[in-house]
Amino acid sequence: MAEKQKHDGRVKIGHYVLGDTLGVGTFGKVKIGEHQLTGHKVAVKILNRQKIRSLDVVGKIKREIQNLKLFRHPHIIKLYQVISTPTDFFMVMEYVSGGELFDYICKHGRVEEVEARRLFQQILSAVDYCHRHMVVHRDLKPENVLLDAQMNAKIADFGLSNMMSDGEFLRTSCGSPNYAAPEVISGRLYAGPEVDIWSCGVILYALLCGTLPFDDEHVPTLFKKIRGGVFYIPDYLNRSVATLLMHMLQVDPLKRATIKDIREHEWFKQDLPSYLFPEDPSYDANVIDDEAVKEVCEKFECTESEVMNSLYSGDPQDQLAVAYHLIIDNRRIMNQASEFYLASSPPSGSFMDDSAMHIPPGLKPHPERMPPLIADSPKARCPLDALNTTKPKSLAVKKAKWHLGIRSQSKACDIMAEVYRAMKQLGFEWKVVNAYHLRVRRKNPVTGNYVKMSLQLYLVDSRSYLLDFKSIDDEVVEQRSGSSTPQRSCSAAGLHRARSSFDSSTAENHSLSGSLTGSLTGSTLSSASPRLGSHTMDFFEMCASLITALAR
């Protein structure tokens, strides 16, 4: 959990200093933010917890977060990070300065055909990317298409989107009536992709004509026009684009154009940039930018190994990983959209097939394409080694020393205070070895035996701690440490920089905030001579009850 702080009179959340309000929505404000260390600008959507609960839109918010976390495309707004406080969620997103396409059309009127085609090509590329990853937007409209400083289109607002499944039909009527397909406003079943095609047709018409094909202040009349599918085609539109519009705005979804049809249309293919529809979409640039890594090291005063470990950990919320992607994305934006392959897609089915990967010598695999690191074993070797023979030895995956515990970036004294509170609540008994090391026991009400464990707080790195759980036996005499400060751990837990804080709302919002990681990160216990029978299970139950209490 993050806390709001003041920075030169301005609100600071995490590493971001908030500035002016960009807009006000149903659930809260969108403010411009600046990363305190890298200086890059972001858009911060502030979602009030109480408001989203009262409006019953928790599912909508979850969908938007899940989808944006999944996507990496040059024409889809990126979600860098979600920061949680007791009162709000802060969605840290890509910032674009050009405003909405809707406002641009209202101000400038219809767009020249060449420019309209360029924007439409970008929009369709993004929609195709969504559909290939089984997501239907369902609320495409000029208000949800943003423009950057170079007049490139970016699709936003995935709150109404749905994941597609084979054989599944959607029936929910959602979105804006002017852009909704006939089957949506009629409440008929629809598969999903075809409703986005209709909306894209309406957007293309708005770009070319400066008006909407179906419009009326009287909603029943508007619905009648949409169901009829009759719209005016101005004389200045050339015949080629007119045929494309008529194909996209077919009332019968079975006769409506598909993305394949649009891509093959002669008007659409003119001046089509190759990066929008790569020939081999399974291949994304699996490279790490050394210059960006060095910049992160300078800004955060950390080592290259720490940055690499953060990227390989696969934790999208890691501060070093977030800063790296901010640098990469801002560089890409400055180069317009020419570096498409730096924005990788979610792993495809062919990723694990070595034959599908063609990595030039000397290039390191991009962390977004890497599976989680695993301990080396005869049956399970890290795919990282197979894909990257040039990986520095210092980053090689070694046989790890596993731990059972919780990782946190809260202050050490705050962590221990929460531990004492939880133990008291559970009726545990404890003995203080030092300020950060406890021996704890609990009596099993059934057997009458005591289950004992050691709790010790380790300093994993300069920003995070590990609260380690260790099973102990009556015969085991723990070595007492004379140190009164948390000790540095050399365990593999340091490779995973998942932040956690103990906040009352974490448990129910775990999937949104990612603020507490009370996970079991290993199963090898440190007991010198563990007893047979139920001792191990009693120990795990004791750990689970403490983790649950800490999460409340």
From Swiss-Prot:
Phosphothreonine modified-residue sites: T172, T258
Superkingdom field: Eukaryota
Sites of Phosphoserine modification: S377, S491
Subcellular location(s) of the protein: Cytoplasm; Nucleus
Family: Belongs to the protein kinase superfamily. CAMK Ser/Thr protein kinase family. SNF1 subfamily.
Purpose of the protein: Catalytic subunit of AMP-activated protein kinase (AMPK), an energy sensor protein kinase that plays a key role in regulating cellular energy metabolism. In response to reduction of intracellular ATP levels, AMPK activates energy-producing pathways and inhibits energy-consuming processes: inhibits protein, carbohydrate and lipid biosynthesis, as well as cell growth and proliferation. AMPK acts via direct phosphorylation of metabolic enzymes, and by longer-term effects via phosphorylation of transcription regulators.
Protein's UniProt name: 5'-AMP-activated protein kinase catalytic subunit alpha-2
Organism in which the protein naturally occurs: Mus musculus
Protein's gene: Prkaa2
